[in-house]
Amino acid sequence: MSDKYNILFTPFNIGKQQIKNRFIMGPMGCNQMYDSYGALNNDGIAYYTERAKGGFGAVFLGVAMVDNLVDNYPPTLVENPLYAPGRYKKMASMLVERCGAYGTKVFGEVGMGGGRNSRGALAPSAVETFNFPNERNREITVDQIHKKQECMIKAAALMKDSGFAGVDLHAAHWGYLLDNFLMPIANHREDEYGGCLENRVRVITEMVEGIHQVCGSDFAVTIGLGVKSFITALNKGSLTGENEAGRTVEEAIEIAKLLEKAGVNAILADVGIYDSFYHACPPGYMPKGHALDLYAQVKEQVGIPVLARSRMGDPDLCLHAVESGKVDGVVLARPALADPYFPRKIEMGIPEKIRPCIGCNVGCYGNMVERGIAGGCAVNPRATRELNTRPRKAVNPRKIAVIGGGPAGMQAAITA
């Protein structure tokens, strides 16, 4: 490895959990990685283990929809640890063991989904629904809030018992239910969960405190935080971010301080919500590192690690982000899908061999969210199919000339 990248392979701590380097595989839903009981299946274990083998210091699982009291999410495309806790623990413990063989920590992720992103779903207030401005979501009751919080804490405890190093809260970003609570434009409540900033953040801080109370201080709690919404109104995104009607960076800093005070151990920073999706899940035309300077403003004001998400899939950009002190590490989701060996190739001194994410959003977001089928990647045909598509070594290796660069030609070259 070139000494140039040394800092990216120094350890750091998330709470009391030491991470061996500055590369985090980001949480990203991958359909068909779970069985009908809401537990990881063998495909899911192979998928995450491949990223551990590829050198990531920690892998964050995709979001678990853990509510089975209010919305009762069925364990179909995403995990739900609470449907069959024993089976979940068995498979999750197997993943921890396999990733641990490579020195990689495993974090779960829990979320509530819903909010104004989904038609008819519960939201803090009856405001206009994303993509359907003439419709209004249902206002959640305090009792329903408490039941959902209870499920989140129970799921985190099960993850801790499975050997996970911590849990990430899919909470303060992307405009789902929990994120809606934080924004005055979507939260018009007059009870303890509305009004001033402390009240609006309360729904999250209560869960953070509850998780630490049940799981202990060694179990890390991280959170996704969108540091700027990039909207001028509900259902009106803003490419430039002028006339912000959602979350400003200044308010994100105050939220980050409250989260740190409540016991959050690290922030996974990004930008945008569904209304400005070109920021939340930026395509290839969005510049790499487009939000890095915004994250740096948050890091200056808190004492916990801030990790950069969103178009960070370039080795030199990763180096700049950490070396400059703008953030403490990088969170790679789509780049980890495109090349599970992203960190390893840098460590081996061959960063030019990294298969880059092209930001097409076809096999990842397109398959998993829009079409509800197995995830994939336009530049990595093995992505999410690691268990059954391992390269086979030729019985009699040969040097051959392959005419044509299509799928058949590429497979012939790999096999030879």
Regions found by a protein language model. Name each.
Residues 1-403, 407-415:
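Flavin-dependent oxidoreductase catalytic cores
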